[in-house]
Regions:
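Partner-binding and oligomerization surfaces adjacent to conserved cores of proteins
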Residues: 1-273
Length: 273
């Protein structure tokens, strides 16, 4: 199972609208980690080129990575986050509205069958040193064997796109305990990406996001949304009653989920006012 901790407003969108919202990673705390990943790959590749005496190619590579970083919004990825941990205190506190929210469990095997193209289900990896990352050798080999290195090489740009995609699933090792997975959309890798973006307008700002149609994705496997959901856990500090939530699910046409509700057993304390 993959566990998605959220608040009840987002839960309503998932259940009633069958829509999973994927938000821009650059608007999340993870933006700095994407940059950390790209800078780490760049340093590992240029160090390796310098050691091989390819000083000019190393310089050009560093300059190209620098230019790419300035265009990071073009490479924006959009994600929804999950954890392998059920009823976890840290997840409730960080992502489940301080325990007042709700957790939806999704069947991982079914989600894997539903994705493809610009949509990927990625396990987050936590790595401090990039020198051992497979992309380093791929960049190094391509640049080393090219007689005249140019950032306009299609193979080089493809590798750069792959680096941006993988950066969306990178986090600092201090977050290893989260055991996170991400459902990631990378619109920049496909000209035929069929999902139209939407915008959430708040008093403070306008945010862009991509809505995944869960009914459509389930329909590809001849499944119903209720088949995708394994259980629903009410947060440890939530005042939500099970009978009201059962009525809500019935009114949404999801009677099959009524018996999959449970209360959290996590001993998280209610926030003090």
């Amino acid at each position: 199972m993959l566990y998605h901790y959220t608040d009840f407003a987002a839960f309503d969108g998932i259940i009633k609208c069958a829509e999973l919202r994927l938000n821009n990673i650059l608007n999340m705390n993870d933006a700095s980690e994407m940059r950390l990943f790209m800078n780490g790959i760049c340093k590992a590749v240029t160090d390796k080129l310098n050691q091989a005496g390819e000083i000019e190619k190393s310089r050009k590579t560093a300059a190209f990575f620098e230019n790419e970083m300035e265009e990071e919004f073009h490479y924006s990825a959009y994600a929804a986050c999950f954890s392998k941990y059920r009823d976890d205190a840290a997840q409730w506190e960080r992502y489940g509205h301080l325990g007042q929210g709700v957790c939806i469990a999704f069947h991982e095997d079914l989600m894997q069958k539903m994705i493809g193209g610009a949509i990927a289900l990625q396990e987050v990896y936590y790595q401090a040193v990039m020198s051992e990352h497979p992309l380093v050798d791929e960049f190094y080999t391509l640049i080393k064997v090219s007689k005249r290195f140019s950032e306009h090489l299609p193979e080089f740009q493809n590798l750069m796109n792959e680096a941006w995609v993988q950066s969306a699933a990178f986090k600092h090792p201090s977050f290893t305990s989260e055991r996170e997975f991400r459902l990631v959309v990378s619109p920049f890798i496909s000209n035929e990406f069929a999902i139209e973006p939407k915008y959430h307008v708040s008093p403070e700002r306008i945010k862009k996001y991509y809505p995944l149609d869960l009914n459509r994705m389930c329909g590809k496997l001849n499944l119903h949304l209720s088949d995708l959901v394994g259980e629903i856990i009410i947060g440890p500090t939530s005042s939500q009653s099970i009978p009201i939530l059962q009525d809500y699910l019935s009114d949404c046409g999801l009677n099959m989920l009524k018996d999959k509700i449970s209360m959290s057993e996590c001993p998280l304390r209610k926030p003090t006012s």
